[in-house]
Design a protein with these regions (language model features):
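Glycine/GP-enriched mid-protein hinge/lid loop-to-helix segment characteristic of carbohydrate kinases
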Residues: 1-2
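Glycine-/charge-enriched secondary-structure boundary and capping motifs
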Residues: 5-134
Length: 134
């Protein structure tokens, strides 16, 4: 399967899986004064990594329509026949780093790094999950 060429990827699956991610350090260095917290989304996906960046009394409400999930993850989901909720528990779904900032900080971050998108908001947690997908 790894050596199979997929038109939607324009390469073999194995090649797509080994493309290095963008280094975050130079970008974060530019906006560190506006960052309140951050989460590197690695194994465990958003569901397991983002809560580590939040105090107990807060939750992150994530708007799933705020970014385009890369075709690689859509293809993996189809090939593995995995539920989308499971995908968010395992993969970063295209979000390798999540920064948490105030509204004003987010505006400043976007003025410096225009590729940064707002994917949700932090809210008080009244029990329940610490990451809410909607």
């Amino acid at each position: 399967m790894l050596t199979k060429y997929f038109d939607e990827l324009k390469c073999e699956l194995g090649q797509a899986l080994t493309i290095p991610h963008k280094p975050y350090h130079p970008l974060i260095k530019q906006v560190k004064r506006d960052i309140k917290s951050m989460a590197h989304i690695t194994g465990g996906g958003i569901s397991e990594n983002l809560p580590r960046a939040l105090p107990d009394g807060l939750a992150a409400s994530i708007d799933l329509s705020s970014w385009d999930i890369p075709i690689l993850f859509k293809l993996l989901q189809k090939l593995m026949e995995v539920d989308v909720n499971e995908m968010f528990k395992v993969f970063n779904m295209g979000l390798g780093m999540i920064l948490i900032a105030t509204s004003k900080g987010a505006i400043n971050i976007q003025s410096i790094l225009p590729e940064v998108i707002v994917i949700g908001e932090i809210q008080k947690r009244n029990g329940g999950e610490q990451v809410i997908f909607g």
